[in-house]
Amino acid sequence: MKIHEYQGKEILRKFGVAVPRGKPAFSVDEAVKVAQELGGPVWVVKAQIHAGGRGKGGGVKVAKSLEQVREYSNQILGMQLKTHQTGPEGQKVNRLLIEEGADIKKELYVGIVIDRVSQKVVVMASSEGGMDIEEVAEKTPEAIHKVAVEPSVGLQDAEADDLAKKIGVPDASIPQAREILKGLYKSFWETDASLAEINPLVLTGDGKVIALDAKFNFDSNALFRHPEIVAYRDLDEEDPAEIEASKFDLAYISLDGNIGCLVNGAGLAMATMDTIKLFGGEPANFLDVGGGATTEKVTEAFKLMLKNPGLKAILVNIFGGIMRCDVIAEGVIAGSKAVNLNVPLVVRMKGTNEDLGKKMLAESGLPIISADSMEEAAQKVVAAAAGK
């Protein structure tokens, strides 16, 4: 689950991280009112969407008068903001963050993720903060410094100080940077985040260290422990199909291709998409029906995939372990009939009650294309999507 920048800053404040004064605004008049409350002479008008690259996309403006606050708010609010993370369609801006300006002397970067190889939380920092951190990571990875934190003790003062020095924080500002790094780590740990990022972390002209941005992603499996985080959820920022899928315990992610995938198990789902790509196709979605796929779930899965106007074919790839193949076959047949399936359907099933499941599909009277291996299934669905 993702949240907005202003919500991330609310979390950072709770953990002692210095952030600029600011408030969200949902209308132009409210934006001007917030600016008046903050006082000038400089304000920043920031689009609030669940995507990075807002500055390059025209979603962040520096205003030097209340008239400019109104002008920029009017420009940004309601716009379809396009960034490298939104896709070509962009994302509509429904809210703004109005905050006080800062005298920026130097932009830095700090971020925290989980390294599954070392099984530790890794704190990253770079002296090359700002809008092009992705380019820094790609072209000069040595500019990003890392420390793997021992979970039982957390981020230590010496580790935080060492990171701060490596990214060029002056000695006089090291204590401030230490508090920010430790506060960011604590916020990451205590909220069950999967990503916590400040970009940029800035050094100001008067020697202060301030988090000028905040980005959090949270582990959806841990949200039951954090109702205060769930309250931050903005459904306007989420894919309607993914929201609908969550109601039926379906793990669904929309993609840009034209071949729908219905699979049980995340690993098999990813392998299925890779195999489709291998044979020249493009997956339209990731869809894991899990180990308890009922007829209702399969039907809803078909409905979700068919909402994609670019869908050309569907591949059902099932390994019958806990889930029996005959149950899946029953769901596929019922689901196909319920939605009047009008695209080619390729089904590959292996495992428990495999023969029975195949027999049910063969006798269903539906134009289902069967396959014995994942490679054969992928080749057949790619050909079907191409109209061959």
Swiss-Prot record:
Residues 9-244 form the ATP-grasp domain. One of its GO terms (cellular component) is cytosol. It holds the Pfam family ATP-grasp_2. Binds 1 Mg(2+) ion per subunit. One of its GO terms (molecular function) is ATP binding. Mg(2+) binds at residues 199, 213. It is an enzyme of class 6 (ligase). ATP binds at residues 46, 53-55, 99, 102, 107. It catalyses: succinate + ATP + CoA = succinyl-CoA + ADP + phosphate; GTP + succinate + CoA = succinyl-CoA + GDP + phosphate. Keywords: ATP-binding, Ligase, Magnesium, Metal-binding, Nucleotide-binding, Tricarboxylic acid cycle. Its EC number is 6.2.1.5. Its cofactor is Mg(2+). Pathway: Carbohydrate metabolism; tricarboxylic acid cycle; succinate from succinyl-CoA (ligase route): step 1/1. GO terms for biological process: succinyl-CoA metabolic process; tricarboxylic acid cycle. It comes from the Bacteria. Substrate binds at residues 264, 321-323. PANTHER family: SUCCINATE--COA LIGASE [GDP-FORMING] SUBUNIT BETA, MITOCHONDRIAL, SUCCINYL-COA SYNTHETASE BETA CHAIN. Belongs to the succinate/malate CoA ligase beta subunit family. This is Succinate--CoA ligase [ADP-forming] subunit beta. The lineage of its organism: Bacteria, Pseudomonadati, Pseudomonadota, Betaproteobacteria, Burkholderiales.
